[in-house]
């Protein structure tokens, strides 16, 4: 049975050129910190890759630190910036809709005397009026808000967030989890993280790279404290011998995710949603935030629990998810609940992640499988 894969928001279908680069670069074994010619060659590969990833961010190469992925990048930024900016206050502001690597790190900081304030995020977009109120009433060291929600794709306007912060005169720093939004926003918004944030995190395997590689953007002139010790690699921010093959593959994936790929994903999304509404009618609920990335959307089959739908879809070779993969073992979807969707929707929620490597034919099979899951529930009622 062939696999029809629409869980690209958990881990995307690999970019073939990126896999090719990974395979070739894995043969280059010299340590990039070594001073002989082989080591210097490996170092050049990393720096060339850094330039390509920086181009995706629209920033300078020296602002990019390579990590093991989005979770490490978020941990490094949230903990590091809170510590660095402790003089401004002890309050970290975020939302319950954030990725677990942000929420858990913020809560862990409470053991060090920090306070976590969760502002509302209806529909996955933070309440900026509440943010303003907190900034005016508390001593905030860090605001951390994702650019694109990993459950429904809702996009947060980082320019407006920065505007609220500037208007209050806060000394807080701003971090954004850009794992889902990186390369997936229109050109006019592609540089927002660099223009308005002090740091931003991304992950290679969400854009067609390989797992185990990510990057952290850090504003020029801002010294990010290291999360670990034991080496001076990556400007001292991330010690340890670099994952050369993963880094080079990430750069290749960045180079192959552009306007054409975004346009294809947008067309596939529209096709799937139109097909679902035409064929399932009132039996499907689809969330479409006013401003969103096209690579994912959240939906529910009415009166079909997520696990029932997932089991049926898996039996016919279709892969989707019901939540962020990093929180898939949780009994409830805290992120969706915090966004105001309600318990009934939450129990039936499915996340569809679309890749430029998906096809229209696969979209037809996805819709047919979802239709089959609904019929399976009705038949077994």
Task: Label the model's feature ranges.
Residues 1-381:
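Pyridoxal 5′-phosphate
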